């Protein structure tokens, strides 16, 4: 394989890389999907283990597409699209079943470090937060147009913030004076509602809530998980790396029951139908050694499910 542009450590240091590869249990002639190509860290490692196998990588970010365009490997196909459309594109490539699927749900280091993207609480930039820069909804539009009720629900549900009503009220008061257009403006409005000595975590939750709404991240995750049911062969592996409790709860529940309600379906005789078997009893977290190398992996949790014959 010829890769003209190595995945930059500043773009995305692959999180839980060895654990992900072990979870996928890669077969040299298997078919694999990386639904979050990013800087290509996981994808490169998967390709290195394939001989006649295929890797299809998805990402809606144009910067990820730029990196993928420099890869020249007959076993690799990059598709610039949201993971909601995996089945559609695989059907186009005449792929019905796959051996493994991996998704790293984190924002890439490159996206965080690029102030113009508006993801970081530490950089001054426009309040954007779009993963797909061709989409229309931005974080600025949300804080400047959503109603009190909608903002409260957003920060309470996606940010898990007790101060959601007060923050929503403050945003509405501030926007009557001038539009809220930058990350710094948002921080100045939000910080007074932070618990003592927890401002960094609080701001991260505020930004998380807006990012989830802008990109419909939980909706995309649900779609991805549901598609995995249809795509994975018996014995195929589902590997998901999540970064906050909302994602992790969805993934844990889905691997355990095959749905989002948390109860196993049953056949006509009352026997439980379990489409996945958890490979590990608990989520895998980064080692201390990895945390030293990549502090942004601190909140990562990896779960692996193996598709049954149901």
UniProtKB/Swiss-Prot annotation:
S-adenosyl-L-methionine binds at residues 40-42, 59, 89, 104, 111. It catalyses: cytidine(1402) in 16S rRNA + S-adenosyl-L-methionine = N(4)-methylcytidine(1402) in 16S rRNA + S-adenosyl-L-homocysteine + H(+). It is found in: Cytoplasm. GO terms for molecular function: rRNA (cytosine-N4-)-methyltransferase activity. Its EC number is 2.1.1.199. SUPFAM superfamilies: Putative methyltransferase TM0872, insert domain, S-adenosyl-L-methionine-dependent methyltransferases. One of its GO terms (cellular component) is cytoplasm. GO terms for biological process: rRNA base methylation. Its main location: cytoplasm. Signal peptide: none annotated. It holds the Pfam family Methyltransf_5. The keyword Methyltransferase applies. Keywords: Cytoplasm, Methyltransferase, rRNA processing, S-adenosyl-L-methionine, Transferase. Belongs to the methyltransferase superfamily. RsmH family. Specifically methylates the N4 position of cytidine in position 1402 (C1402) of 16S rRNA. This is Ribosomal RNA small subunit methyltransferase H. It comes from Amoebophilus asiaticus (strain 5a2).
């Amino acid at each position: 394989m010829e890769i003209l542009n190595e995945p930059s450590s500043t773009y995305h240091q692959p999180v839980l890389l060895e654990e992900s590869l072990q979870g996928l249990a890669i077969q040299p002639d298997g078919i694999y999907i990386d639904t979050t190509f990013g800087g290509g860290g996981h994808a490169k490692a998967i390709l290195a283990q394939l001989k006649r196998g295929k890797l299809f990588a998805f990402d809606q970010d144009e910067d990820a597409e730029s990196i993928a365009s420099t890869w020249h490997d007959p076993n690799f196909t990059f598709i610039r699209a949201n993971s909601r459309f995996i089945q559609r594109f695989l059907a186009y490539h005449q792929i019905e079943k796959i051996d493994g699927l991996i998704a790293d749900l984190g924002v890439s280091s490159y996206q965080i470090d690029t102030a113009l993207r508006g993801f970081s609480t530490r950089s001054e930039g426009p309040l954007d937060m779009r993963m797909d820069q061709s989409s229309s909804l931005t974080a600025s539009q949300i804080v400047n147009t959503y109603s009190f009720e909608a903002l409260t629900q957003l920060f309470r549900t996606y940010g898990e913030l007790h101060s959601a009503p007060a923050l929503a009220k403050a945003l509405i008061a501030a926007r009557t004076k001038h539009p809220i257009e930058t990350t710094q403006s948002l921080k100045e409005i939000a910080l007074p509602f932070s618990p003592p000595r927890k401002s960094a975590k609080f701001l991260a939750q505020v930004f998380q809530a807006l990012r989830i709404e802008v990109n419909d991240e939980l909706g995309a995750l649900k779609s991805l998980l549901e598609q995995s049911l249809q795509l994975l062969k018996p014995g195929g592996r589902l590997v998901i790396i999540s970064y906050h409790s909302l994602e992790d709860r969805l993934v844990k529940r889905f691997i355990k029951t095959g749905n989002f309600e948390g109860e196993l379906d049953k056949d006509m005789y009352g026997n439980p139908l379990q489409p996945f078997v958890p490979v590990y009893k608990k989520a895998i977290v980064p080692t201390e050694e990895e945390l030293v190398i990549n502090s942004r992996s601190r909140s990562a949790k990896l779960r692996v499910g193996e598709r049954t014959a149901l």
